[in-house]
Structures are given as structure tokens and as C-alpha cells.
């Protein structure tokens, strides 16, 4: 086995791990929604979409044996993570500044009209307001945890893209 094969195997394992982490995060969101009665707002649902997209791209990439295709999927993961960072940062700023709103009247119909909201309403239907602050977990608000998660994913995947850029030529 050469170094490229070992690196590919390692990368695919890390992508599988990322996919499972995203599933765990979405399961945690459902736990908070249904057990703790913390209704998701439009920005929460958008963050769920980003975590779902990252997980789907990670699982698809893990099944590929071609560096170029993996690189494309990792680029898509990085784009979704960047979108998640922006959404979570906006959500966190709304919760830190109580006079603001996410624009529930504007965002809610758009988010609720997306096809996944029709297919999986328990997961992707809006039921709350962005300015509702739920109890922090270990001193950090939920959008703060999402921001940390998206930022870690973005940095990890961006470093992987940078580290493996030479494999694209080969």
C-alpha cells in the first residue's frame, strides 16, 4: 500500500466520522425540540439544513475513491459550513441583542415552503422565534454551539483541501 492509498483511506474514514457527527447533531436538535420543548426558529431550521447538507456530502465523499471527486465534495462541505457560520453568527447576534428579530414573518413561509419541510415536517418546520433564548448548555447558547461546530468543520475541511491540493494533479 502506498502513501496515497493510506491517505485516501484515512480521508474517507474522517469523512464518515463527519457524517455521523452531523447525524448526532441533528438528533440532538430533535431531542431539544421534542424532549426539552425548545421550538426551532427559521434560523435554527436553516442551520439544520446546513448540517444535513454537510452530512450528506461527507457520506457521499466517503464512498468515493477518486481524489478529485472527494475534493469537490469537500469544497461543497466547506461552502455549507461557511453558510452555517454566517447563519449561526446572525442567530447569535439576534439573541445577544434582544431588540432585534430574525424576521419571522419574512423567513418562516420561505423555510416552511421548502420541500424537506413538507417531507419531514417534524425536522424542518418552523415553530419558534429566533429571539427566544433557551437555557445555555455549559454557558453557551445553542447558536453559539452551532457556530463552534460549523467553524470547526470549516477549518478542518479547508485544511484538508489545502493539504491534499497536490493530489489533484496526480
Curated annotation (Swiss-Prot):
Compartmental location: Cell inner membrane
Ranges that cross the membrane: 15-31, 50-64, 72-89, 145-163
Keyword Transport: yes
Regions of this protein lying in the Periplasmic compartment: 32-49, 90-144
Disulfide bonds: 41-44, 102-130
UniProt similarity note: Belongs to the DsbB family.
One GO process term, biological-process aspect: protein folding
NCBIfam families in alphabetical order: PRK02110.1
SUPFAM superfamilies: DsbB-like
Membrane topology (Cytoplasmic): 1-14, 65-71, 164-170
Primary role: Required for disulfide bond formation in some periplasmic proteins. Acts by oxidizing the DsbA protein.
Protein name per the record: Disulfide bond formation protein B
Molecular function GO labels: electron transfer activity; protein-disulfide reductase activity
Main localization (coarse): membrane
A cellular-component GO term for this protein: plasma membrane
Membrane topology summary: Multi-pass membrane protein
Organism (species): Burkholderia ambifaria (strain ATCC BAA-244 / DSM 16087 / CCUG 44356 / LMG 19182 / AMMD) (Burkholderia cepacia (strain AMMD))
Alphabetical UniProt keywords: Cell inner membrane, Cell membrane, Chaperone, Disulfide bond, Electron transport, Membrane, Oxidoreductase, Redox-active center, Transmembrane, Transmembrane helix, Transport
Stored InterPro entries: DiS_bond_form_DsbB/BdbC, Disulphide_bond_form_DsbB, DsbB, DsbB-like_sf
